[in-house]
């Protein structure tokens, strides 16, 4: 069982690193609100979010990550994305 626990920790840590990378993209955009609705940026962000969701789903299916933990990870990113859109509409 300890091996499974270690694998779960490694899997969750990797998901967190990927989430932090996406969070960094969001924060860079929030700091540089010159082109917040840039279609290219939105496409990259959507692709990254989709990819992370698939990673989370896969880790959950393998039993490496708890479904609720994966959901909370995605929720955290979605909240940051919401802040970006809110900041943009307040600047306009």
UniProtKB/Swiss-Prot annotation:
UniProt name for this protein: UPF0358 protein SH1840
Family: Belongs to the UPF0358 family.
Lineage: Bacteria, Bacillati, Bacillota, Bacilli, Bacillales
Name of one Pfam family that matches: DUF1507
């Amino acid at each position: 069982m300890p091996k499974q626990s270690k694998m779960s920790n490694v899997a969750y840590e990797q998901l967190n690193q990927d989430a932090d990378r996406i969070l960094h993209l969001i924060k860079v955009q929030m700091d540089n609100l010159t082109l917040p609705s840039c279609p290219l940026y939105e496409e990259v962000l959507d692709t990254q979010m989709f990819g992370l969701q698939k990673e989370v789903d896969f880790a959950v299916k393998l039993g490496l990550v708890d479904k609720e933990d994966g959901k909370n990870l995605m929720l955290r990113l979605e909240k940051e994305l919401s802040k970006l859109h809110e900041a943009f509409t307040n600047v306009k």
